[in-house]
Each structure stands twice: as C-alpha cells, then as structure tokens.
Amino acid sequence: MDQKRLTHLRQLEAESIHIIREVAAEFSNPVMMYSIGKDSSVMLHLARKAFYPGTLPFPLLHVDTGWKFREMYEFRDRTAKAYGCELLVHKNPEGVAMGINPFVHGSAKHTDIMKTEGLKQALDKYGFDAAFGGARRDEEKSRAKERIYSFRDRFHRWDPKNQRPELWHNYNGQINKGESIRVFPLSNWTEQDIWQYIWLENIEIVPLYLAAERPVLERDGMLMMIDDDRIDLQPGEVIKKRMVRFRTLGCWPLTGAVESSAQTLPEIIEEMLVSTTSERQGRVIDRDQAGSMELKKRQGYF
C-alpha cells in the first residue's frame, strides 16, 4: 500500500476516533449498534482504539431478527467475549409471537417489525440518547445526504429536510428528553477504504465475506445461500454447491451471494476495484419500493 493511501486511511481513522470520543464525552447513555458485518467490525476496532487500554464505556447492541447466518451469531458471541464487551441482544417479542419471517410475510414487513420496531423498542427500553451505526455515505443515496450526527425525534423518526449543519467538524448534539442522535463515524469511508483498513489492521471478519463452496439456489434473480431448513423449495428450484461470497451481510433469505473466487483480503480488494455494481445489490430490502431505504429511515430504521 503506497504512503498516500496509508495517510488517507489514517486521516479517516483519526476522524472516526474523534467522533467516537466526542459522543462518549457529550452523551449520558450511548450505545454502539453491532450488526456483525465488516463495517461493524471496523467501527468496533476504532472504538477499542479510541479508549485503549481501557474498555469500551458503552455497550454493544444487536437487534436480532432470528434470521442471521449461523456464522454471524458465532462470530458475534466470540468477538464480544474476546474483547470483554457488554453485549445486549434484543428481539422484538411481538414479532416472535406473530411468527414473522421473510418467506411468509415478505421483506418489507419482516424488516419493519423485526428490525425497525425492534430497534426502537431496544432504544426505548435502555434509554439510549445516542447510537453509533456503521452506515457509510457511499452505500446508498439516502445515506449519502445524512449527517454524521443524525437527529431523531422522540418517535425515532428522521427528517431529511430538517438536518443540522456540520461545519468544520463541529457537531450539534443538543437534544431534549426522549430525542436521540444516530451517529455515523464511518460516514466518509468508502467500501474500498473499509477493506484496505481491515487488511492494514488485520481485523477479523465473518468468514462469509471470503469465497467458499456453499449451498445456494437461484430465486428472484438472487443467489440465496441455504443456511438452515426453514425454507420451502419452489417448483424447479435446486440447491447446488457454488463458489460464492458475500459483499454485505444481513438476514440469510434477504441477502444475495455473488459468485467469486476471492479467498483472501488482497483478492477481495482487487475484485472490488473492478466491480461496477453496488455492494448492496444483494440486499432485498433495498428493492421493496422506490426510495425504500429513505422511507425506512424516516420510520426509525438505521
């Protein structure tokens, strides 16, 4: 990696660490959202750097839908234990009682009940006034226009037309009781930055990001990896072993794999540099309707 690129990564690192420390100093009850993906792994690494040699002054929160890949759950528990982090896991009890799942109820309803409502329940339950998230501006157009300090009202709603100015790295965290701030320390990072930083810092990631032979089937233009037996095959569908990996991770029925032979970080970086598609092309929830991500964020989604 050339010196110019290395300096760029260190500038991003310094900015993110500054934001994380600022939130810890300014808010009374912050939390770090932990979705187990590559961005969460980088954000957690930066937080550990920010407070080294001490422990994190806030817990990790995973809003569990019950449909993550098994390797993600294993990685989550192992990581929290290894780093001595307080891990809070919340699953929407109403959604569980209703038996909500992406196959029967569809991606939009599943996401709304198990993720958006689950997140709002958890934030209210613990009274968090600031929540870190690993979203980046290059991922999706609604995220591109969101501030680093993203104000949410007492109903957790985001108004993109009423955002606070952020001049010269000055962030406005003033809130009233019941309101909160979503904080995005990785806003100015790109997918390329994330992968090169993971390689530079030797950050552990979920093995699903690396190519391997996995059982998949084609459905709705997506390669779906079959992670357990909670699926009913449709006529003509056949499960086959194919060499695939994931560019983004979520609920396994809603996350498409990509055919790939990249089994190392340098190979992933090389593959990504020539890719002409978004990393979120495999996320079914982004296709629900036009502007679906912005609508979800207005309703309280991260």
Curated annotation (Swiss-Prot):
- Enzyme Commission number, as recorded: 2.7.7.4
Q: Which Pfam families match?
A: PAPS_reduct
Q: What class of enzyme is it?
A: transferase
- Coiled-coil ranges from the UniProt annotation: none
Which pathway, per its entry? Sulfur metabolism; hydrogen sulfide biosynthesis; sulfite from sulfate: step 1/3
Q: Which UniProt keywords apply?
A: ATP-binding, Nucleotide-binding, Nucleotidyltransferase, Transferase
Q: Which reaction does it catalyse?
A: sulfate + ATP + H(+) = adenosine 5'-phosphosulfate + diphosphate
- Annotated GO biological process: hydrogen sulfide biosynthetic process; sulfate assimilation
> Which Gene3D superfamilies does UniProt cross-reference here?
HUPs
Q: Which GO terms describe its molecular function?
A: ATP binding; sulfate adenylyltransferase (ATP) activity
The job of this chain, per UniProt, is described as:
With CysN forms the ATP sulfurylase (ATPS) that catalyzes the adenylation of sulfate producing adenosine 5'-phosphosulfate (APS) and diphosphate, the first enzymatic step in sulfur assimilation pathway. APS synthesis involves the formation of a high-energy phosphoric-sulfuric acid anhydride bond driven by GTP hydrolysis by CysN coupled to ATP hydrolysis by CysD.
Family note: Belongs to the PAPS reductase family. CysD subfamily.
What is annotated about its quaternary structure and interactions? Answer: Heterodimer composed of CysD, the smaller subunit, and CysN.
Q: What is this protein called?
A: Sulfate adenylyltransferase subunit 2
Organism in which the protein naturally occurs: Citrobacter koseri (strain ATCC BAA-895 / CDC 4225-83 / SGSC4696)
Name the gene behind this protein: cysD
